[in-house]
Regions:
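Long, low-complexity, compositionally biased intrinsically disordered regions
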Residues: 1-466
């Protein structure tokens, strides 16, 4: 098993690591290269007297290196995998240090399986109930304060709100964090950026964006007041939006959904001092969409995940919520993609209807994944729309994805030129996130190949991953 060059480059934690990894992808720099199954290893000269020892499991993918880098994978791990992608490393007997790493991975996997089968430790239900009630009280107080703040803001009007400094919004967000409602705090912190943004294609005008953001906050607040009137899954979705974590006990009781999951794309974002990675998947048999989110820090790297363009053969467990989307990996393995398709892709009209149905169930959602079949990408000229402007944006979107049933504006993105070049005017299948105004593409299928947007938004070139 080998990963493609594009799949490996998409694993890079940032643009500098990607470039540095390519610099290490020269076989002459490596010594003691070898392979055992999906595991490869080698040694490369570093800054010290002893070479760095690097080992990687392509099935993870996962890697380990003796260099001092805190990035994962480091440039040496990327370089080793790139060497194998260019020309498969020959089989060999693993040295002691590589064998020890392989054995350690097997031991940890076995231990995790054993822990999963162990009966849960007894819980102090009284203490747990006390902690739960204390949080409910703090969140309730935070909701009261947010309600008053929103009413005051609306009395003064959106024009006054647009003139408020960042500190005005940050103070409210800080009080929501203190009230243990981090989901609401994140939304409040995003509001000044909406108000100050310049008009751009595939997005509402700044004042409309601010009004929409405040409206979603108000709807979420109202839903949070009526949890008892909602179904258990709907209530769980509201609580997740407020920032309540899903406990291990809750996830242990969730059913597994087995399928061959096509990994369409990765997306990496920086949130405060955390690195958040989303892995977007769709079931080849079920057509179910899934988003697996992992967090990492400088001292705690992101866990391994299947690369974009691979298939994950196994099970996911979906977190409670309506509609379901967030999931976690259960048992399974990554492997080559069966074929480059976007399961469940449909027309633009069908995608609009699906988005509307989803929004009706959870109107505070900010965006939702959509799949389009055989759409063309291009500039939407005034002549094509009878000279009309978009009533929401006030101007025509620069580019759109469309078919005979309609079109969706493409959100502004520095990677769009690469996307348009790959599409080359041909009908393509497209996967992306839609917010009601613009579609933000993440993956494209054309000519029997899957192309993914780079995980890092700063990387401008689309990657052929399958």
């Amino acid at each position: 098993m080998s990963l493609t060059t594009a799949q490996i480059l998409d694993l890079a934690p940032d643009a500098s690591s990607r470039k540095a990894g390519q610099d290490q992808a020269k076989p002459q720099k490596w010594a003691g290269l070898g392979r055992a199954g999906t595991v490869i290893w080698g040694e490369i000269k570093g800054s010290g007297a002893s070479p760095y020892r690097t080992v990687a499991d392509l099935a993870g993918p996962a890697s380990k290196c003796t260099c001092p880098s805190r990035k994962f994978p480091c440039k040496h791990g990327l370089g080793l995998m790139l060497v194998d992608a260019a020309s498969a490393i020959a089989d060999g007997e693993p040295p002691d240090w590589a064998a020890a790493w392989m054995k350690g991975r097997e031991s940890r996997a076995a231990a995790a399986e054993t822990r999963a089968k162990e009966p849960a430790k007894p819980v102090d239900e009284r203490a747990q109930a006390k902690r739960r009630q204390a949080r409910e009280d703090r969140v309730g107080a935070a909701l009261d304060e947010l309600d008053l703040w929103l009413r005051d803001l609306m009395r003064r009007g959106l024009a006054a709100a647009r003139g408020e400094p960042y500190a005005f919004w940050d103070r409210m967000a800080g009080r929501l964090v203190d009230g243990q409602a981090p989901g609401l705090a994140r939304r409040v912190r995003a509001l000044p950026g909406l108000a100050a943004a310049a008009p751009r294609p595939g997005a509402p005008r700044p004042e409309a964006a601010l009004g929409l953001g405040l409206g979603r906050l108000a709807l979420l607040l109202r839903a949070a007041r009526r949890l008892d009137a909602l179904s258990p899954e709907q209530a769980a979705g509201v609580r997740a939006a407020l920032g309540y974590p899903v406990t291990a006990e809750e996830m242990a009781g969730r059913p597994d959904q087995a399928d061959t999951w096509a990994v369409l794309a990765h997306a990496v974002e920086e949130e405060d001092r955390l690195t958040a990675r989303s892995v977007w998947l769709v079931g080849r048999a079920s057509g179910a969409l899934a988003q697996v989110i992992d967090y990492g820090t400088a001292g705690s790297p992101l866990p391994p995940a299947p690369a974009a363009g691979q298939d994950f053969l196994g099970a996911l467990a979906f977190q409670p919520g309506d509609p379901p989307l967030r999931a976690v990996f259960r048992e399974g393995r990554a492997g080559p993609a069966a074929q480059a398709v976007i399961p469940g892709a449909a027309s633009v009209a069908a995608a609009r209807d699906s988005f509307a149905e989803t929004l009706a169930r959870a109107p505070w959602l900010e965006r939702w994944p959509v799949r389009l079949s055989r759409v063309r990408l291009g500039r939407l000229a005034a002549a094509a729309s009878g000279g009309r402007t978009d009533s929401k944006t006030g101007s025509l979107p620069a580019f759109a994805a469309g078919d005979e049933t309609g079109c969706l504006a493409l959100g502004a993105d520095p990677r769009l030129p690469s996307l348009l070049a790959v599409a080359a005017g041909r009908p393509v299948d497209l996967f992306g996130l839609y917010d009601g105004y613009g579609l933000h593409p993440l993956a494209l299928v054309t000519g029997g190949h899957l192309y993914a947007m780079p995980a890092q938004g700063a990387q401008p070139v689309l990657l052929q991953v399958a």
